Amino acid sequence: MTTSRPDNSHDAAPKGYWIVFATINEPSRFDNYTSVAGPLIAAQGGRVLARGDVATVVEGTVPGRPYLIEFPSYAAAQACFNSAGYQEAIALRDGVAQFQIVIVEGFVPPASSPR
């Protein structure tokens, strides 16, 4: 699914986000993935803003534990996911966890008009 992007050229660059839903089947083996993926994400400026240790689904069905990871830009979020290192890290979670990841561009509201 693609959508048109708002023109934010006059504003500060919007951040990029990974919206992740993870179903972890083998927590002890999942640590192998996190020990590799965590530093790769951090190297791209990524940081976990929220994780679903405590979460309430108020509408619909959520396909796993939610995570929200922020990057300095949409391009950085894409670059991290597409990097050779992260693609290798994905193999560490095969059979251990299932992920659904959406990369989104943050919204930067237009600057206020002077009064």
Where are these regions (language model features)?
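Short S/T/G/P-rich N-terminal loop/turn motif that feeds into the first structured element of a domain
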Residues: 1-65, 72-82, 105-115
